[in-house]
Amino acid sequence: MQSYKYDKAIVPESKNGGSPALNNNPRKGGSKRVLLICLDLFCLFMAALPFLIIETSTIKPYRRGFYCNDESIKYPLKVSETINDAVLCAVGIVIAILRIITGEFYRIYYLKEKSRSTIQNPYVAALYKQVGCFLFGCAISQSFTDIAKVSIGRLRPHFLSVCDPDFSQINCSEGYIQNYRCRGEDSKVQEARKSFFSGHASFSMFTMLYLVLYLQARFTWRGARLLRPLLQFTLLMMAFYTGLSRVSDYKHHPSDVLAGFAQGALVACCIVFFVSDLFKTKTTLSLPAPAIRREILSPVDIMDRSNHHNMV
């Protein structure tokens, strides 16, 4: 007699003994999805909390003195800025988010790429991950910037023009002057103590470098070899010009801009390579192995087959 044994792929069981497909609880999955989204929003809020506290409160920067013969803080105050805060935020955020939306829709609609997210709609899931990572990086970058500004309190190039100290009450022969009184508007004086490091340089470098790395990961069309590098270098030149304009506007020292570039680039690289999945290798799910029939022979069958081969 011959008997057959089937080896079947083992399906992992859930806690109550059944397969995952049979134990899929929609209500439990929905509550877990909401919990994860709330956790992400909480993390985003905590990342932006230092920035929000410093910008909306009366926290004053460190009060630093000066030298009377310091030429680096004697520049005039320019009323107009080459790139103001509104333009910086609008261009940096809008361009990046629009490009991310376009890239993710193309990836899902035309390339038919799937997502393992708990969010069922693939478009919403992709935008949630990529835009969420970008906004998280913006919050981290701005929090770093504001912490440095209030902690160091470096004087801007136009500090003396804004402060307008009474030099008749100051003895410049003492060298470093710490006891002085500013006759200028207090809000402008406090802002003139936030030179290091440049927020425009750090924000523009973060947004543009993040978009450069996003294009490197998502722009896979090989039709025009120089199109992607052209777009990437254009974005970097926009960030570079933004930082340099702060020097010509007498808002920052050159070292402030360089430090801002370095901080923005560092945060962008950390977010792209350690937080997002842009450059992570995608693993494919392997299908269960088919059932394999193995023939089990009894001792009598083995002897019969042996005799048959000997006769042949």
UniProtKB/Swiss-Prot annotation:
The lineage of its organism: Eukaryota, Metazoa, Chordata, Craniata, Vertebrata. Magnesium-independent phospholipid phosphatase. Insensitive to N-ethylmaleimide. Inhibited by sphingosine, zinc ions and modestly by propanolol. GO terms for cellular component: adherens junction; basolateral plasma membrane; endoplasmic reticulum exit site; endoplasmic reticulum membrane; endoplasmic reticulum-Golgi intermediate compartment membrane; Golgi apparatus; Golgi membrane; membrane. N-glycosylated. Contains high-mannose oligosaccharides. Residues 55-85, 145-194, 245-258 are extracellular. Residues 149-157 are annotated as: Phosphatase sequence motif I. Residues 197-200 are annotated as: Phosphatase sequence motif II. Gene3D superfamilies: Phosphatidic acid phosphatase type 2/haloperoxidase. It is a multi-pass membrane protein. Residues 1-33, 107-123, 216-226, 280-312 are cytoplasmic. Coiled coil: none annotated. Magnesium-independent phospholipid phosphatase of the plasma membrane that catalyzes the dephosphorylation of a variety of glycerolipid and sphingolipid phosphate esters including phosphatidate/PA, lysophosphatidate/LPA, diacylglycerol pyrophosphate/DGPP, sphingosine 1-phosphate/S1P and ceramide 1-phosphate/C1P. Also acts on N-oleoyl ethanolamine phosphate/N-(9Z-octadecenoyl)-ethanolamine phosphate, a potential physiological compound. A motif (Dityrosine basolateral targeting motif) lies at residues 109-110. SMART domains: acidPPc (SM00014). It is found in: Cell membrane; Basolateral cell membrane; Endoplasmic reticulum membrane; Endoplasmic reticulum-Golgi intermediate compartment membrane. This is Phospholipid phosphatase 3. The chain crosses the membrane at residues 34-54, 86-106, 124-144, 195-215, 227-244, 259-279. The record marks D256 as: Stabilizes the active site histidine for nucleophilic attack. Forms functional homodimers and homooligomers that are not required for substrate recognition and catalytic activity. Can also form heterooligomers with other PLPP2 and PLPP3. Interacts with CTNND1; negatively regulates the PLPP3-mediated stabilization of beta-catenin/CTNNB1. It catalyses: a 1,2-diacyl-sn-glycero-3-phosphate + H2O = a 1,2-diacyl-sn-glycerol + phosphate; 1,2-dihexadecanoyl-sn-glycero-3-phosphate + H2O = 1,2-dihexadecanoyl-sn-glycerol + phosphate; 1,2-di-(9Z-octadecenoyl)-sn-glycero-3-phosphate + H2O = 1,2-di-(9Z-octadecenoyl)-sn-glycerol + phosphate; a monoacyl-sn-glycero-3-phosphate + H2O = a monoacylglycerol + phosphate. It comes from Rattus norvegicus. The active site is at H200 (proton donors), H252 (nucleophile).
